[in-house]
Every structure is written in structure tokens, then in C-alpha cells.
């Protein structure tokens, strides 16, 4: 029976690896944490056909049997200027699976700063409790605030859904002003859930119109030549002085 060698350069539990092995008796699954191709045993590159990795990207000449690279990340900007990208090896991403995790992070940051948690933690570290607590810790609610989500893919949609649950107004920035196409991949538990669509849609040429209306701005754009320096000095100056920028791109 022909086998298929699968290598993971990220650390997964034995339970998860055994679940992968159970897919087919042909799979030979090997794992070693590595951030570069040089950190893996040389003999592995002669065998590997499927690679799961974050940044350990071999030259295809070094891995003659390699057919498929599954990236741990949603973006591939760090792959595009490599021999691997220019080869016939298939490269796929994890776009879509991070939506709940990253959206919760965004809401956590918005809540932390609106509720003055950094100030509270600083006082705690100094073992002090200010007498003017109201002036120091009074917090605006997320409810009725406006959040602008730049990049309305799977993560942006989930940010919008959670923001709506907090009673926020959601502005979405995407390439076209239509209703938008569904993400190429969406977790089954998120698909079709209400509240994901923004209250208003802006295209990139209307960025200067959207930013002044936002109390919070979420930067969820992929890193591409078109988005490089998309948020520049002019964009920052267009924002409210009190606005919070959360960058998860």
C-alpha cells in the first residue's frame, strides 16, 4: 500500500494527530515544531507530500514529492515572494476558521478600553484607589457607538454580528457597495446567523467619509500591495481623536 507522508511544523496534541491518522491507513503523520525549513530533519523533505505549516517553507527542489501546503494562517503575503509560490505546489489557507477567535479578541479590546481597564490595572499595580474614581473610570457604553470594520470577510462579518449584539452601529468597508458575496469558507455554526451584515457599506474611495463617523475602527484587511499603507497619516487624522483602532490584519 502506497503511503502519504504528512508533516506538521506546528505543535498539535497526540489526540488531534491520531484523528488525522484515522482518516486513512495510508497517512504517515510526522510532527516537529519549526519556524524555518532548516529546522526539520533533512530526510523528511525527501518524503513529505503534504505540509501543514506557518512559516517553514521549503524550496520545491528540496522537497521533490511535495504536492500540497496547508497554511496555518489566513494570509499568504509571506509566501508570495518565494520559490514555493512560483511552483506547481498547491497552497491553501485557513481563511474563515479564525473568525470566532479574532472577533472575540476585537470585542475584548473594545470593552477593555471603553471600560478603562488599562487605567484600573495601572492603579492596581501601584496599590492605589483614586478618590476621583468617577472622573478616572467613567466609561462610555458600546451601545449606540459606531464601529467601522475595514475588510468584511469572515472575520469582519463575525465582528459585525457581535457588535450588533452589543447594540452598536456597524459600518463595513469592502471593495464593492453591494450586499457582498458570502465568505469562501464559513464555520457551520456561524453560517446564516443574523446580524452579520453592516448597517451601511463604504467602498475604499469613501474611506475619508466613513472614518470620522467611527468611535472604533477595526482593520481586518489582508496584507496585499493594494492595502499596504491603506491606513496612513491622512486616515488617522480623519478619525476622531477619541477613536480606538484595533488592527487584526
Go through each PLM region and give its residues.
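N-terminal glycine-/charge-rich "phosphate-binding" loop or analogous flexible N-terminal tail
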Residues: 1-50, 179-181
Amino acid at each position: 500500500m502506497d503511503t502519504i507522508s504528512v508533516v506538521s511544523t506546528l505543535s498539535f496534541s497526540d489526540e488531534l494527530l491520531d484523528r488525522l491518522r484515522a482518516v486513512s491507513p495510508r497517512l504517515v503523520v510526522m510532527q516537529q515544531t519549526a519556524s524555518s525549513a532548516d529546522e526539520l530533519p533533512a530526510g523528511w523533505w525527501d518524503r513529505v507530500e503534504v505540509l501543514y505549516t506557518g512559516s517553514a517553507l521549503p524550496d520545491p527542489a528540496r522537497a521533490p514529492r511535495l504536492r500540497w501546503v496547508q497554511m496555518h494562517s489566513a494570509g499568504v503575503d509571506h509566501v508570495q515572494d518565494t520559490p514555493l509560490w512560483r511552483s506547481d505546489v498547491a497552497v491553501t489557507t485557513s481563511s474563515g476558521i479564525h473568525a470566532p477567535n479574532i472577533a472575540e479578541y476585537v470585542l475584548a479590546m473594545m470593552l477593555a478600553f471603553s471600560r478603562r481597564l488599562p487605567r484600573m490595572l495601572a492603579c492596581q499595580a501601584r496599590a492605589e484607589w483614586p478618590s476621583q474614581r468617577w472622573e478616572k473610570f467613567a466609561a462610555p457604553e458600546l451601545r449606540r457607538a459606531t464601529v467601522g470594520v475595514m475588510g468584511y470577510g469572515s472575520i469582519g462579518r463575525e465582528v459585525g454580528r457581535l457588535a450588533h449584539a452589543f447594540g452598536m452601529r456597524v459600518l463595513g468597508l469592502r471593495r464593492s457597495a453591494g450586499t457582498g458575496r458570502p465568505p469562501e469558507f464559513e464555520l457551520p455554526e456561524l453560517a446564516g446567523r443574523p446580524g452579520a451584515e453592516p448597517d451601511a457599506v463604504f467602498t475604499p474611495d469613501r474611506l475619508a467619509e466613513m472614518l470620522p463617523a467611527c468611535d472604533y475602527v477595526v482593520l481586518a484587511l489582508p496584507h496585499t500591495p493594494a492595502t499596504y499603507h491603506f491606513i496612513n497619516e491622512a486616515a488617522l487624522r480623519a478619525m476622531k481623536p477619541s477613536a480606538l483602532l484595533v488592527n487584526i490584519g
